[in-house]
Amino acid sequence: MDKPPPVCGNIEVEPCGQRIVVAGDPAGLRSLAELLTWLADLDQESMAHLPEGERAHVHLYPGSQISGNSTELELCRLDAKGTGAFPRGFESAGDQARGTGYPEWFMDDPDNL
């Protein structure tokens, strides 16, 4: 698929201190997951309009794909077309990058959201 899938449901993106909170209803979270999967599976090498060394990305705009009071969201591939290089200054998440780090999970305490 050349075009990204549509964003459905409700998604909100907002800064909260040193964090970015991404919240959504079930449909919104599922469509965001589909968009991330699309971006991950995208064959950057076959994108003639994407220059070598650049990275595929999509923008989600407040009042359009995400809630009107959201902060604009840009979702990007880290690996550059042609080189696979990550951006200068990138720092790995350590164990999480190898699939062994689990996110903290807060189900019942709204103060942890």
List the predicted regions and their residue ranges.
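Positively charged, low-complexity terminal tracts
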Residues: M1-L113
